[in-house]
Amino acid sequence: MELRNFFERAIRASFRDLALQDEPAATYLADLLTRFVRTENVYPRGVALPRLETVVDMLLDIQAAWREDSPYFRPEHEVTVRRHIGDYTMFMIGVFRERVERMASTGYYISQGKHAYRFVSEHVRVGAGAAAPPYRRLAERFESYAGALDYARRVHFPEGPCHPFLRLALE
């Protein structure tokens, strides 16, 4: 079975079990899991840093992109990084909640994820209108969707950290 289909089935089944009815969000989360199978998508290159590994790194990258005197001046880069902050925090809280609880503040991740998706939602709404991806709902229902990812992990990836996907994501 293709990996994307595997994730889509797991997420849709989890949404059904949890009575979450949002097809665009389910599709987005399946795409997110598929993208984040590759470590370089979890920790992308920044404009000023070789690899963005933490939310703080990502926020610093946004600042670097806005400095006019910097060779990295690219204000449009903020939307890309904010989307990644939303995706990264959703992924980490949904799939690796215990790790976030050990290494960072879950509340901080939730607030940064919501803020990031809200920012992207407003930016996309101005340019794309109603056809925009579900960033606003991702912001508004962040905890519910992260909970759905956690549920999918426990039900559909019962091997925990030994599951091939979970091993790949942390390499």
Descriptions of predicted regions:
Residues 1-170:
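Polar/charged low-complexity regulatory segments
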